[in-house]
């Protein structure tokens, strides 16, 4: 059990009778072909619409009994109360004693939410106003570099949530861009990305955004230091000063204003984060500045509005018709009860190319835990291994394993129904879009039913002479269809997955808002780096010592 700021103590789903009933149900053999054969209304029963998003989960290995027990399981851990605690600013991040109020970042200005006597909504909209002012200065050409030229390129330097979120969103919404200012992203600490990028940029017209919640992330600050050196090398030739370079070519986004100032970020160019915003939930905050620069503030506000619409649905819809709740419960059923320990995200839309990477971080960093909120070791499976790729590329990469391998894998198919303008009907581009949709539906069908069941349903005779051509089927999947990809629908889609993560964490009784598993490696890297600089032999394990010795011999 865990205590929130309002001293609410929640029940554990693990010890409810519904958990045991689901374990019993999971022991039965599940056949998707049989489930569809038994009920010709199955798809209508296991599908629903929420705003511009349609979800078909009929190809999951569930029936009415499983769904009823999953919903009862959610009630047994007081999921409704947990959702309200999240939305109202209770201390749901128990290990760090913080709220997790990413949903407040998309509340309308007319709303009010108090946290420690402070009106969070007022603070959020003050920050959004600053984002708007800075982004419009860049977009309009009034922001000038040290030589007086307008900014043509913006480089977002960040890692994790400070990189993946803005990168995913700007890529997805690039056709909404209404500026000639290009936006780039750098995250890798080895300098390769930055070095390759700087070769093609003009230092006099390049602006850098340093995004780091702590403003102490070594990956980010090492790239920022290199960027500063690159700028200063040109500024000296143009009689520019270091102060003018820092002032005209850097914006900082962090929860640590003191460190931003110490680095040299001008106070007017510092954007605030709050401790109650987790990195992987932060694209809605000032971290989204790169998005606002690329698609404009009106587009960014539509992104926020789409997410808020999903927040409302999550908070108000009955669980049986609640898309995030159902998506989360199905994920728990697959991972914990059916032992489906791998999950893949398959968007059939090139604009969503970074969505799988974004969701990999969102789910695995949030729910990759083995201890409950009250410190007990977990005796059940939690977050599956998650990966993904654009569907058409994945078909030529790992679909072989999905169709004919030995691993059980659950899948999310994501596609957009409408693409291109009405004037583009029956053009080659429109035909390509229809071909992509056809592949999306076809692949989910083959994964679900295999060649034997499909042949039978189509009135054909299945041939089993060539065993190597056998498609076993019975791979569970959910299909999510957006009416079309817009800032609003993308916001709703991202928020859907955020809430899915929270539902799963609530059932598993884990904290999805911390990430202690990333800390020790970073700390150890400091010791290893120190050892690299010293002449004497390192004092680690024999493998690490030998690797260091080899590196030193070649350096």
UniProtKB/Swiss-Prot annotation:
GO biological process, one term: gluconeogenesis
Keywords: Cytoplasm, Gluconeogenesis, Glycolysis, Isomerase
Subcellular compartments: Cytoplasm
Entry's EC annotation: 5.3.1.9
Domain of life according to the entry: Bacteria
Principal place of residence: cytoplasm
Active site: 365 (proton donor), 396, 522
Function of the molecule: Catalyzes the reversible isomerization of glucose-6-phosphate to fructose-6-phosphate.
Protein name (record): Glucose-6-phosphate isomerase
